[in-house]
From Swiss-Prot:
It is an enzyme of class 2 (transferase). It is found in: Cytoplasm. This is NAD kinase. Involved in the regulation of the intracellular balance of NAD and NADP, and is a key enzyme in the biosynthesis of NADP. Catalyzes specifically the phosphorylation on 2'-hydroxyl of the adenosine moiety of NAD to yield NADP. NCBIfam families: PRK03378.1. Its cofactor is a divalent metal cation. The gene is nadK. PANTHER family: NAD KINASE. NAD(+) binds at residues 73-74, 78, 146-147, 157, 174, 176, 187-192. The active site is at 73 (proton acceptor). Coiled coil: none annotated. It holds the Pfam family NAD_kinase. Its main location: cytoplasm. SUPFAM superfamilies: NAD kinase/diacylglycerol kinase-like (SSF111331).
């Protein structure tokens, strides 16, 4: 048999009984089909199986052809930052809530995976953003798949900032914060803030002021080729940045924040019968009333 993928990694964080049964069933199913399987270390320890190959997420990224992520979108976000460094392809089994990134249903995951492992899939290269903090010419860098959020440390406290696009001043804003989102992140926090939904492969970035103090402030969609720079008012004391929902870190009024497209991509794969608008309709409840009337 000619395998599309030879070595498959299984990754996940939650180790409750329900999750463990999914890990166990998936592992045994792949082994019976003749694949080499690498279990992430914590899964291997929890399953306590004999003669298993285990490793870190980095090991899986380096050695495997495909990683199967079991969890929610949060799990995928955490893992994306590591696996985007490798040519490995990624697919997710959703045991979380919405599951925009982990789109396989646990109940039908094996049958869908069987279809995919026979070559019936396509790849989406989801770009990441670089978030660069500059202070006294010293740079620190983070990578995000969904969004970066700049906000005050104090609840309901506005911040003042200037936004430059390609080093040209674009606008000044007083707001609770600012969201910079990728197309992948357009169905996450950006959506809750009133941002548009973008097709995943659009080469674009969303800029959304959060609760702006101004009647004419609107979300912007710009080319992902552009560089975004944020400068803060000298009046502002307490600022933080959150990257993909992780614990915020402090920034200061004399810091500059530069955000631009990374050279890294998450290589996400889907079944050939996957359709993004079907996902939006199901996840967001579009057209429910319409279909009820027809019935």
């Amino acid at each position: 048999m000619n395998y599309v993928f030879c070595i498959i990694g299984i990754i996940g964080y939650r180790l409750c009984l329900e999750q463990l049964s999914i890990y166990n069933n998936l592992y045994n199913w792949l082994i019976k089909k003749g694949y080499s399987v690498i279990l992430e270390n914590n899964i291997a320890q929890a399953l306590n199986l004999n003669n298993v190959i285990s490793g870190s997420t980095f090991d899986i990224g380096e050695k495997a052809d495909l990683a199967i992520i079991i969890g929610g979108d949060g799990s995928m976000l955490r893992i994306a930052k590591i696996l985007s460094n490798y040519p490995i392809k990624v697919i997710g089994i959703n045991t979380g809530n919405l599951g925009f990134l982990t789109d396989l249903n646990p109940k039908s995951a094996l049958s869908t995976l069987n279809y995919i492992l026979n070559g019936n899939f396509y790849e989406e290269k989801r770009f990441l953003l670089n978030v660069i903090t500059i202070k006294n010419n010293i740079k620190s860098k983070k990578h995000i798949l969904n969004e970066v959020v700049v906000h005050s440390n104090n609840v309901a406290k506005m911040i003042e900032f200037k936004v430059y696009i390609d080093d040209v001043f674009s606008f000044f804003q007083r707001a609770d914060g600012l969201i910079i989102s990728t197309p992948t992140g357009s169905t996450a926090y950006s959506l809750s803030a009133g941002g548009p939904i973008l097709m995943p492969l659009l080469n674009a970035i969303i800029i959304i002021p959060m609760f702006p103090h101004g009647l004419y402030s609107r979300p912007l969609v710009i080319s992902a080729k552009s560089k975004i720079k944020i400068k803060f008012s000298k009046k502002i004391l307490n600022l933080s940045i959150s990257c993909d929902g992780t614990s915020p870190f402090k920034v200061y009024r004399n810091n500059e924040i530069v955000i631009k497209k990374s050279k890294k991509f998450l290589k996400l794969i889907h079944s050939n019968n996957y359709n993004y608008f079907n996902v939006l309709r199901k996840k967001l409840g579009w057209s429910k009333k319409f279909f009820k009337k027809i019935k």
